[in-house]
Amino acid sequence: MNKLPHETRVVIGMSGGVDSSVAALLLKEQGYDVIGIFMKNWDDTDENGVCTATEDYNDVIEVCNQIGIPYYAVNFEKQYWDKVFTYFLDEYRAGRTPNPDVMCNKEIKFKAFLEHAIALGADYVATGHYARVAYMDGEYKMLRGVDDNKDQTYFLNQLSQEQLSKTMFPLGELKKPQIREMAKEAGLATAAKKDSTGICFIGERNFKDFLSNYLPAQPGVMQTLSGEVKGKHDGLMYYTIGQRHGLGIGGNGDPWFAVGKNLKENILYVDQGFHNELLYGDEVIATNVGWVSNEAKEKEFKCTAKFRYRQEDNKVTVQIVDENTVRILCDEPIRAITPGQAVVFYDGDECLGGATIDEVYRSGKKLDYLG
């Protein structure tokens, strides 16, 4: 039997930002028994001894007091290091470009946090993500948030039926300007707080400086595929496929882009032109596949896919290789498909699941220098 809202405990992850603040407010207004939890995933004391997590937690405390809900802080630093940060370093070490947000959602926010919330008697967890959950045809479906510009299903692509059955996304039907307005009307302390961007554990720090604390940089040669040396790179891990900034190649003509990496010889391949054919792939092998539905997939099916966040939907054919691997055939060649990033599958507004980009091909030829 379904519980009434006041009998339903919802434990919401609160970051100290406006989105999770309004999500908590909405749940409270809807009559749920709401508890706010601040997750401390990273020791982020900066060089001045200021811990931004402390500032964020103070914002959570203020908002929870304004709304009238209890709050706690939970430390997931060890789990985050083991499951997210170690993966992040391993991928960069392998010359790939990882997506820690996908792993954080899978392992921390909807696993470690979910388990903690259930121990607190939660019926559901909630977050400030822009996504929707619907129960249709006997199973849970994850749908894009109505705000196209903010939809975050790309980062949630690994969530399972079990996780979705315990999840609420209060912001899924709203657009960002509405959320800012609600926060303002309610007088929430975070109403005017700037949105956080970038990788959470790097924050405002310089990416190169941060990464070099954990992985020794190995400078090497920057050259074209035909062998023309164009300069030196600071370390392959600092560059991603399709990158333009930071190459330092002067001269006239079209701008230069990173088009590939040779890990064995520590070479960064570069070439000119945004639409350079070296940047385009039409076939992808992806691994670590996760489907939202438990129903068996057809061996081959058509859908759309995003190969990076906020990319337009691309028409593709997905072929199931095995339970962990798919082959993706693109209707049109796609620019800068990057090993290590997530590819996420959609049927209209429904997010079907996702995988990690492993190998990229063009016209049947493997792009060995990608990755």
From Swiss-Prot:
Keyword RNA-binding: yes
Protein name, UniProt field: tRNA-specific 2-thiouridylase MnmA
Catalytic activity field: S-sulfanyl-L-cysteinyl-[protein] + uridine(34) in tRNA + AH2 + ATP = 2-thiouridine(34) in tRNA + L-cysteinyl-[protein] + A + AMP + diphosphate + H(+)
Pfam families: tRNA_Me_trans, tRNA_Me_trans_C, tRNA_Me_trans_M
GO biological process: one example: tRNA wobble position uridine thiolation
Gene Ontology CC, one term: cytoplasm
Compartments where found: Cytoplasm
Residues annotated to bind ATP: G13, M14, S15, G16, G17, V18, D19, S20, M39, G128
Residue positions of the active site: C104, C200
Region Interaction with tRNA, residue ranges: 150-152, 308-309
Residues of the site described as Interaction with tRNA: H129, Q341
Function noted in UniProt: Catalyzes the 2-thiolation of uridine at the wobble position (U34) of tRNA, leading to the formation of s(2)U34.
Disulfide links within the chain: C104-C200
Family indicated by similarity: Belongs to the MnmA/TRMU family.
InterPro entries: MnmA-like, MnmA-like_C, MnmA-like_central, MnmA-like_central_sf, Rossmann-like_a/b/a_fold
Gene name in the database record: mnmA
Region ranges (Interaction with target base in tRNA): 99-101
CDD domains noted in UniProt: MnmA_TRMU-like
Source species, domain of life: Bacteria
Enzyme Commission number(s): 2.8.1.13
Any one Gene Ontology molecular-function term assigned to this protein's record: tRNA binding
Keyword line: ATP-binding, Cytoplasm, Disulfide bond, Nucleotide-binding, RNA-binding, Transferase, tRNA processing, tRNA-binding
